Amino acid sequence: MLANLAHQVVRRRWIVIGTWILLTFAGAFAAGQLSKRWFQSFSIPGFPAYVANQETLKTFGTGEQPPMIAVFTTPGKDVTTVPGIQQAIDAGAAQVHKPVRVGSWFDSHNAMYVSKDRHTMVATIYPPGNATFDTKPPVKEVRAALRKTTPTGVTVHLTGRDPVFESQGEAGGPSVLTEALIGGAGALIILLFVFGTLPAVAMPLLVAVTSILTTFLCVYGLTYLTDVSIVVQFLVALVGLGVAIDYALLVVFRFREELSHGLNTDDALVESMTHAGRSVIVSGSTVAIGLLSMLLIPLPFIRSIGLGGMLIPLISVLASLTLLPAMLSLLGPRINRVRVMPQKFVKPHSPDEGFWGRWSRIVQRRAPLVFVAGAIIVAVVLSPAFHINPSDAELNKQPAKGDAGAGRAAVTAAGMPNGLYLPYVVLVRNGASATTLASVADAVSKTPGVAGATAPPSWRTGSAGLIEAFGTDDANSRTARRTISRLKNDVLPQVETLRNNATTKLGNAAGVKVSLGGIGPENRDFVHAVYGKFPYVLLFVLILTYVLLARAFRSILLPLKAVLLNLVSLGAAYGIVVFVFQDGHGSNAIWGIQATDAVISWIPIMIFAFLFGISMDYEVFMLTRIREEYDETGDTSHAVAHGLARTGKLVTSAALVLMFAFFALSTGPGPDIKQFAIGLAAGIVFDATVIRALLVPATMQLLGKWNWWLPAPVARILRVAPSEG
């Protein structure tokens, strides 16, 4: 089939090239239009906290964004008696688009807004509307109004989640185009050392540019069918760059090798497509399977990344199997002309020469020792993953500068609870009388883990009302999870039942509805929504990948080994992310991010979706060549040695290309993109070194002929020829 495709592409090469040129220009136009069409919010339909927050938003105009926290300090004075502070709060709130919701001591006279020594007071200012990537509360304007109107002798700061993020300068990151150029520059340097000639270097880069822009065109069309997350733009640019170059690298590598064996252009293309093209299809399929699994997660945000991301490998494969052969047929032997690197850097070796040839012989002679060494490295790198904490970081673990940092320090110095940054918000519907609200607030305030709760009189409208509660700990902390669980599963259902029993006796048939909202509970719902389904996602990917590889390599044990080692690579990537970001080893020195005690909740699932398939590429590159050698010789040791020797440089080069692309992605704004990019980069490097250079060849050497075992009954199910064991 692939040989026939090669013939058809060569015969119609100008049509193929012209079609891709048109798609590329259309994609460039579409990329410019996408800024207006990205989906920019997180939503978890059907989950209780999200539903409560959406109902609060519908009724009060607020509820999906955390409050900004105004902090007033009066050393030596009772802050509640200082005139003018309430007017300052009102002036700050006036800078926020209406409807704005404010919680303070002046509205409720509740002690939770005041420190025990009564020298510090906080006020919560809730911005209206949904939270999106572009939503930026008017932090500077509110801060300026507070400073201008706060009485003399009172120190005022504005802190909270959004002021802290604003102090980090997250909006100042490089553009997607800049990141792509950084990644492209790194890829160019690597390709120069791999090929040494300008035409050979240009081929993968042209395929990458075409694939990226065509993917943007497809994503643009997808936005008219469903919501697509803004995160996809980073993935298309950087993951697309790495994947497309990797696939093109494999084909060009094989094409030059076949030319060096004396084949003419057409025959070299047929051989390249038959072998390297097959690897590209299998590799692209494994990446697509990982991303397809995201559709099993019941979150539009994650599903849109899966859908948009799945286009990356599919279009990269298509370009590598059509556009690239068409261009190679025009170049032919001229691909080795216009040398830009000295011959000594790229001089080809026979399979038994060079570093990888020598290394393969070392591995085979000492396979048990190499396997043990690799296993020890895996154990060390993977071990931090066992205490991974998928959650947003607590606010006091976030880097904060200037006034936001000073405000946070003032709250801490006053001994006020960390839970005030992300308050719990309880929504009461269908009968939110003052008595009912007071009863609910009293029950909430007595819950372990809650520092205080109140129902401000201004937080009532019609039959609905709100209660604000400060937890003793940050709502994203591990201890707060128990508090959220108590409130959601015990306290609020009980108080709802009691109030309904009371109203029924009074002849009121309408049932009071009490539900827990706020950013913290919604974050926990997000984690449950994602990781509650993760076992099914994992099983789906493992089964599909195993079947695909079993057909490709005609073996039972090889795909099992590949899947297990890929899981090891994934665990190592998690371990590195935990070690660097959650535990803080190096994150502050490199990115100015202190230990967060958490990995942002959506990062682990997305690392899995991309890394499982991408790292499998290298397994496919190696095993395809090893299987080819084994089919020719019937000698496992010879096949492993020659397979590693012939693909070692290729796998290393491909991994370095992706590593540069992901490091470029790590320069993007926000700790979430950094964690995601470093997780992918670390996983790729670990996979190409420890897994592919140590564990894969050592394991195959130890398994011997069992590598190729495929009983006839299984072969019939897979519809392939059986293989001896």
Where in the sequence are the language-model features?
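Membrane-embedded transmembrane helical bundles of large multi-pass transporters/channels
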Residues: 1-36, 128-390, 511, 519-725
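Short hinge/gating elements
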Residues: 37-40, 393-395
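Short beta-strand segments
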Residues: 71, 124, 253
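Disorder-to-helix initiation segments
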Residues: 41-42, 49, 238
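A detector of helix-start/N-cap boundary segments at the beginnings of structured domains
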Residues: 40-41, 79
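Structured non-transmembrane domains adjacent to transmembrane bundles in polytopic membrane proteins
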Residues: 46-67, 75-160, 387-588, 598, ...
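N-terminal cofactor/phosphate-binding cores enriched in small/glycine residues
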Residues: 22, 30-34, 45, 53, ...
